[in-house]
């Protein structure tokens, strides 16, 4: 079985865009924790597309954004790595019961809109690296 790099990159990017748009929709109806979770997924998938592009290999099975960033071999400012570390928490906190309720309380309108805007900006920055 051959590995089609371009097809795999397209798969990750199409899926990332869908997740980002769905996250925006959830933000509008005030489903804040899930909007942030999908924002995380969108970043994860763009990073996976970058991993495939730079390594010509399948992206690893992980949700850790900082690990994926490292695997892209793309120079990223420390501030972006810090953001990725923060957004990885959106995946964990929105899914696991011990963390879920605290995350729901933290996910206010102001917090969620600010973080989702940051995610969109980072998404755009990452897309430009393709």
Where do the protein language model's features map onto the residues?
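Terminal alpha-helical segments
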Residues: 1-130
